[in-house]
Design a protein with these regions (language model features):
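A short beta-sheet element
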Residues: 47, 61, 68-122
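Short loop/beta submotifs within extracellular cysteine-rich repeat domains
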Residues: 3-5, 32-33, 53-56, 91-92, ...
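Short acidic (Asp/Glu) and glycine-rich catalytic loops that position anionic groups and cofactors
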Residues: 1-3, 106-107
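Short coil/turn segments at secondary-structure boundaries
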Residues: 34-41
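Sequence-specific dsDNA recognition surfaces
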Residues: 22-34, 49-81
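Non-catalytic DNA-recognition/assembly elements of restriction-modification systems
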Residues: 3, 7-30
Length: 122
């Protein structure tokens, strides 16, 4: 019996309903802005490197911004979306995620995935 099967047997004795990721979420890649595009005031953004260096599991405010002009070409996460770093310089940080809980859409950089879903983000 696998570790997952043991946990399910222990915590969910009546079993669990299995769903594919596609049944509860859609996944898209982030945009294409870089650190050089950061500015002091503008559109909130999350750079993939910040996911594992600056953020915890949840965020409702960003650390950085990009200009309106740069933002026009980007992809955005909406409230409750999961933003996942899909690359890193070390294995521990690959696939680290944050749940975006802010009240406005946030631009997401490349090397990130936006997971839009209908689940509780916490």
């Amino acid at each position: 019996m696998s570790k997952l099967e043991k946990l399910i047997a222990e915590l969910c004795p009546d079993g669990v309903e299995y769903k594919t990721l596609g049944e509860i979420a859609s996944i898209s890649r982030g945009g294409n802005f870089q650190k050089k595009d950061f500015c002091d005031i503008g559109v909130p953004c999350i750079h993939y490197g910040q996911i594992y260096t600056r953020y915890d599991l949840f965020a409702d405010k960003t650390i950085t911004h990009i200009t309106e002009e740069c933002a026009r070409k980007q992809k955005f996460a909406k409230t409750n979306d999961i933003v996942m770093a899909v690359t890193s310089e070390n294995i521990e940080d690959v696939c680290k995620c944050i749940a975006w809980l802010g009240n406005e859409d946030v631009a997401v950089s490349g090397h990130s995935a936006i997971i839009s879903h209908n689940q509780d983000p916490k």
